[in-house]
Every structure is written in C-alpha cells, then in structure tokens.
Amino acid sequence: AAGKLGIHIDLYESRYGQYQQDILDHKSGLYAFNPNIVVLAVHEGDLHLPEYSQRPEEDVRKEVSRWTGLWQMVTEHSRARIVQHNFALPCEIPTGHLTTRLSGSRYMMTQAVNTRLGEAAANAVSLVDCERLSALIGKQRWCDPRYWNMSKQAVALEALPLLGRHTAAVIAADLGLSRKCLVLDLDNTLWGGVIAEDGLAGIKLGQGPDGEAFVAFQEYLLKLKRKGVILTVCSKNNHADAIQPFEKHPEMRLKLQDIALFLANWESKPDNIRTIAKTLQIGLDALVFVDDNPVEREIVRKFLPEVDVIPLPEDPSYYLRTLSDYLLLETSSLTAEDTERTDQYRARAQIMELEAAAGSIEDFYRSLRMQAIVVPFDASQLPRIAQLIGKTNQFNLTTRRHGMAQLEAFVLDSSYVHLALRLRDRYTDHGLVSVMIARQQGDILDIDTWLMSCRVIGRTVETTMLEQLCRRAAQLGCTSLRGTYIPTQKNAMAADAYAKHGFERVGNHEGFEVWTYDLAAKGLIANTFVKPVDSWELADGAC
C-alpha cells in the first residue's frame, strides 16, 4: 500500500510480543535502525485492562499513561514520527447490550482509552482509527478466530488490505505526501444537468433525490476546504454560465469565494489543470481530478499521469462516499486556520444545548443571532418552493397545493405578492424554509398560501414573514391583511398563527376561518429576533 503512494520502505520489525522491550531499551535494534516512522500495530488484546473494574477511571488513566509513556520513550530516543493503531472493540461480548451501561466493563474502558489516546496524541502522534475501520468492513470480518488460534493474527486476512491502505495514508500525511487540491468539474458533478442548456431553474440542486445528493457532495467539499484542501474548478463551459449557480442559486452550497481558481472555458482539461498547478504554484502530483465524464477522466489519466483521478460512479448519491474513500486527502493535524465553523450536523445539537442553557426563550432567540433573506420568487427557487408547497402539512394554513405552472403564473401576475424566506443563524444556513403567496384585492392583501418547514418551527420565522408582508402591503397602499385557516388533521399547530399576531377572526364558513389585520390602525408587525438582510455577505455575526 505504501509503495503505491510513492513511499519506499525499509522495514524493521520487532519480534512477536517484543515491541515494548524494543521501545524501552535505548540500545535496541529499533533505535539502531534510526526509523523515520514507528508504527505501533497493536490490537485490543494488548490492553492491560481487566474484564471488569471497580475503578474504571483509574484503570483507564493508568493504561493511557502506559501508552503515552511508550510514545515519550520513542520521542526521547529517536526523531521518529509515531503512528499507532487504536483498538477495535470486540464483537463477542458476554454481557451483550448491557455492556454499554457498565462503565467498568472492558468494552467501555476500551472505548475510553481510545478517546483519551486521541486527546493525548494532539499533533505529536497519528492514530489509525481501527475501531472505525472494523465497523466499515464489519466486526466479524475484521477478526477471524481461526487466524488468531493458528498464528495470533489479530486482524483477518481479508481486512489487512483495508488496514494497510489506511495506515499508509496516515504515514503519507505525516511525510507531507497527501494531495492538496481538488480540481472539480461542474455539470453533473456539482449539480445535475448542464447549466448552459437547462438554465438556473433546470439544474438539479436542492430538494429531491438527485438534488440532495449534489448538495451533500458540496457540503462534504466545504468540509474538506475547512481542513485545508484547496478547491478549484475546471469546466468546459462559458464562464458567464458557469458562475450563475455560485452567484444566484439558493441551494448552492459552494460560493465563488470558496474556489481558489475558477477556470471555465473551452480549453482541454489537461491544459487547464496545468494552468491551475502553475498559478497556485503546486505540483501536478498535489492535484486530484473529480469529473463525472469517463472520457475526460481517461484523457487526464493519459496526459497527466501525476494527477490522481477519482472514478465517480454513475449515481450521484455515491459521489460523497467515493470521495470519502479516497485516502490521500488525509491530514496529520488540524489548526485553527484550517477550520471555519461547526458543521451542520453538530449545529442542531448545539442549538438544543443553547436553548436548555438560556435564561428565557427571548434570550435563546437573541443568542441564535438569526438572519433572514426574504425575497420575491425567482425561477431558480420555484422547484424548491413547489416541493415545500407539495409536502408541508404541519405549519400550512390552507394546504393549497400549487404546481410549477401555477407558481410561474403567480410570478408573472402583478396582482400577486410572493415571498420566499431563507434562514441563517449562528450555526448554519437552513435554506429556503418558508413561503407566502397573497393577492391584492383593492385595499386588502389576501393571503392564499402561508407555510413553513417544520425544521424551523418555534424560531419566530412566521413573524418575520408577516412583517415582510406588512411592508409589501403598505407599499401597495393596502390598509388590511386577510388570511384563511383551513383546518386539517395535520395542521392544528398553525391554528393560532393569526390570533397571536393580532389578527381578528371575522368569519367561519364551512370550517374555514377568516382572519383580518387592520394595518392602518395597528401598524406593521415586527420581529426583533430575526434580522432581515439582503445577502449573507451583509449578515454580520452569523456563522
């Protein structure tokens, strides 16, 4: 595995069970060998832990101290970088699922040792996460008792290639041999479809199976960028077409400022890749080419053999996994400069922690530093808006379903007011989460559709939508708003939406409730917890 990465290895191997003696004896063959890398290829059986402990914290502390002591000895007697395998948890557990409730069990102590070693390693020691690798391949495939009984081989033969590849990748990162830069195609790579032919509204990006896959892929790319991987674009496209999604598509996660070098032209991919390497002053062997087109991939392989090429599968749902399986983007450390913000999956947990710690609900809202972009519908948003209208049931006042054709008609009809809201807070961008459609009838602005994604319920987003509708009504010279609530089996939570914002119920016809708001008498509805902004670039304090 190391040879395939360009690492030439001269190997010193301790005798079976003698690695500790080699490390502790400064005159051992290990130090005479003068290693650059010391790999501690250990396994769960090497842990000095009892099957059950009455003092698990103390036993874990001692075991971690034993391993960090070995690290210290290597550091004192050599210049070697240390790479250690952590400990794959066994699958044969006598106490079964009860084990996770027994802090003194060997299983739980092993988990704790893994965690503490990760904390202790910092930037001095690299760990190969064997626990994760064993889960990837399957616990029962990771360790075959036949090989252990015959030769004390802790890792099954079929799992050794996986372990070898990952160990080699960690060594490569320690030696500075990881790849630094992704060269990204655009059409059918970052989004579905061809931007020059399908237009901004026609590409697949956002909600829906394919669209969500491309969003997920972009989000993973952003995470790579945050750990220091350079992102570049190499696309056969007109530049003006190619930048449109980056500048205008609301579901585009990558922005132009995330791209170090953007090349969209009709030059050959090899020529453009050479330009990228030259401009950024990095070698071709630092580049990784990512393109859905097998012909373009083969051309790059042929003319630029130094460049690694990712073989993307046909189904974009597997783009993320394919790139995740590519190991030469491994890094040996992470600094504050490499990371920008907490990822979206951790954001939800952080928000819940923040709410629990807040002194009041008002304090919680303020602490989120929420901001919203509220704009009229545009073509790129319509597929997402149509989907929201089609599937939102809980906070949906009328549950009227409007398709693409109707939405396009609303956009063209000047008597309609239509608003789409995107929400962002201190943790994440929630995307397009609320929609409102109203029609002017004289001095009344009548609300036809008002809905909100369940992801942001309880965040005062509904107040912001009414605030913006009031402002638009005032601009049109309307003196009142009118809304309808049509009860269903699923939208009971929206029953008081009008009442709590000062509307008065004026009628109830065949189960339909009609509400009005006297704009002239009561003034604009306002929300002090969500700050309206024109663009995220102008939104201070977020993320």
Region locations from a protein language model:
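Alpha-helical cap/lid subdomain in secreted, periplasmic
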Residues: 2-158, 165-181
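Asp-based phosphoryl-transfer active-site loop
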Residues: 180-195
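Basic, amphipathic juxtamembrane/active-site segments
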Residues: 195-221, 305-312
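Substrate-recognition element of Asp-dependent hydrolases with the DxDx(T/V) motif
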Residues: 216-250, 263, 397-400, 406-407, ...
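A conserved beta-strand-loop-helix scaffold within acyl/acetyltransferase catalytic domains
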Residues: 248, 373, 377-455
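Conserved Lys-Pro-Asp/Glu-containing loop-to-beta segment of HAD-superfamily phosphomonoesterases
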Residues: 273-294, 300
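Terminal substrate-recognition subdomain of acyl/acetyltransferases
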Residues: 279, 301, 305-368, 471-543
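Acyl-donor binding region in acyl/amide transferases
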Residues: 426, 432-508
